[in-house]
Amino acid sequence: MKKQRETEQQESVIAPRVGEPVAKKQTRKKLVKRILLGVLCFLLIAGGGIGWGMWSSRYPERINMGTSCNMEDMNMSDMGSMCQAGNSGSGTPIDTLQAPQTAAHIDTFTLTAQPAHLSFGSGNASDAWTFNGTSPGPTLHVRQGDLVIVHLVNHLSFGVTIHWHGITVPNSADGVAGVTQDAVKPGQTYTYRFLAKDAGTYWYHSHQESFEQTGHGLYGMVIVDPVISTVHDDVDTALALHTWNSNPILNGAMGTVHISAQSGQWVRLRLVNTDNYPYHLTLVGTPFLVAALDGHDINGPTPLTAVPLSIDGGQRYDLRFRMPENGPVALLIAKDGDQQYAKTPAVLVGQGQYVSSALPSLNQNEFNFATYGQPRTDPITLQSHFDATYTISLGFTIGFSNGRPGPVFTLNGKSFPNSPEIVVKPGQLIRLHFENNADSGIHPMHLHGHTLTVLTKNGRALAGSPVHLDTISVRPHESYDVAFYADNPGLWMLHCHNLYHANHGMDMMIVYPNISTPYAIGNASGNFPD
């Protein structure tokens, strides 16, 4: 009986009641059919739309980034129509864009990509991908003007490369999988060769699936000492900020890094953010100077006291200070989103007891390079003649990136490989206007192979020292104007150095005309730079 009642109830959902007019019965059936048909159509359209979105967003099997257009045919105000990539058979071969023959002193290194089980301290250990068994890998210390030769040996089970972040290498040594080389396969060796032209703090990391590989340990630092130094540092230490399993680590370890220094000595801390997200930091115990940004000296830096600094993905800060008579100097850090600095210092310089009872506030005005230091004459200014100016709008949407549903980060409304391409002619002075008008996060935009001169922040000219960067961080509702000389022919990436954003579309190319490459990005080649 119970089963019979259930059956009757189910039938009553679509069956007419006894005595109901025939017309009403037919109308009811039609209505049910229409509803079912509508639901079916909706599911087919939605499913088809999702399927089309996933399919159409996938990278082609092969994307060649070579260029084959003539500058005379290009409209310099329109990025989208300037030049078509995809010709690998004509033009200057990218492999010929190498460091010149030189009698300079040679520094030779071997970096072996290999797996390792690493201890990060405080009972934390994990499998990692490393250079020479450590993460960060060895710090490469060279002198300005030296010829640097690095042999990459791959003992991992997948392809890797090395990109020299911030160093103006020739294009063949840029280390971008699918653009300047194929990823180095397991068991293979590849050699990079470049001149260390500019003194400063730089770093290196894999640019094959860089979001995954850099995050899992394939990175290290490069220090280029100047031929003639204008200042003397008694203590000089490089420090790599990174995150492992959501825990901040410094030079591959949790806890406090201890650095020896005596009263009256000058100390330089070279801070490198190898992570995707910002770190907030400050020094307590003595006033400090911001001596350099992205490896380039600040003119006339002035003392700061416990001022917060924000260092975004890929950026570098050189901090200098003189050790006080009494007590240590502490570097405090906070991850983005933290309400205060960690009570345990990240770095402790000198002897004595550190007291954390009065942590400086994260809410006070943070360091602003646009007003820091002393003005001086610079080769590039707002009054310079610019051969071309381009606006790059940084955005965000929900959609598909290479077949994956989720966030998509865009440049002028498009994501890689459909993002706009800028073609520049050797000798031109190029102006870029970056704007972040959406709440799409912080975008540290990194240009390979060139140095950016910052002209304006939010429409206002810089009032302090000239600022030269390779990674310009654009926060929500900020804008910057920057400029660079097109003096390094090749095919160069411009991308967000939050590598998650780059991995989800925030990449574009700045290329010179008539450059050919035998390499390609995509499934057929196995090259995926981000």
PLM features per residue range, with description:
Residues K30-K33, I50, F109-S229, P278-L309, ...:
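Histidine- and aromatic-enriched segments that form or immediately flank copper-ligand environments
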Residues K2-T189, V224-D225, T230-V267, P308, ...:
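N-terminal, post-signal-peptide metal-ligating segments of extracellular/periplasmic oxidoreductases
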Residues A173-D174, A183-K185, H232, A238-T371, ...:
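Histidine- and aromatic-rich segments of cupredoxin/plastocyanin-like copper-binding domains
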